[in-house]
Regions:
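Acyl-CoA-dependent O-acyltransferases
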Residues: 1-109
Length: 109
């Protein structure tokens, strides 16, 4: 469905890459008494646009979601790896360590 929408009517005349930046809560929340450790978000692919980047925060985490149809990116990890490398370059230019903080997921692997 996403691939079909991305190809329908050619290129979108209004936009071709939606990017959303959503600041999240700065303190951990609870749902039914359970501590919320992570929040996941993703934006939709729209007609004529085969790529969506969504960025959001939760407490001390910065999260990035990349959604793509197969004709735009065969492997979305190519884009996310490039983002990580660019982020490391920015950290180094700012005089910070290139080592990124890894947050262990609470979800079962």
């Amino acid at each position: 469905l996403f691939r079909w929408l991305g190809q329908k009517d050619g290129q979108n005349k209004v936009l071709n890459l939606p990017i959303s930046n959503v600041p999240g809560p700065r303190e951990r929340g609870r749902v039914g008494g359970a501590l919320v450790t992570e929040i996941y978000s993703v934006g939709p692919l729209s007609m004529g646009s085969g790529l969506n980047i969504t960025v959001w925060s939760y407490v001390d985490q910065l999260n990035i979601s990349v959604l793509s149809d197969g004709s735009t990116l065969e492997d979305p990890h190519e884009l996310t790896d490039a983002m990580i490398n660019a982020f490391i370059e920015i950290r180094c230019a700012a005089g910070l360590s290139e080592e990124l903080t890894v947050v262990e997921s609470a979800m079962a692997q």
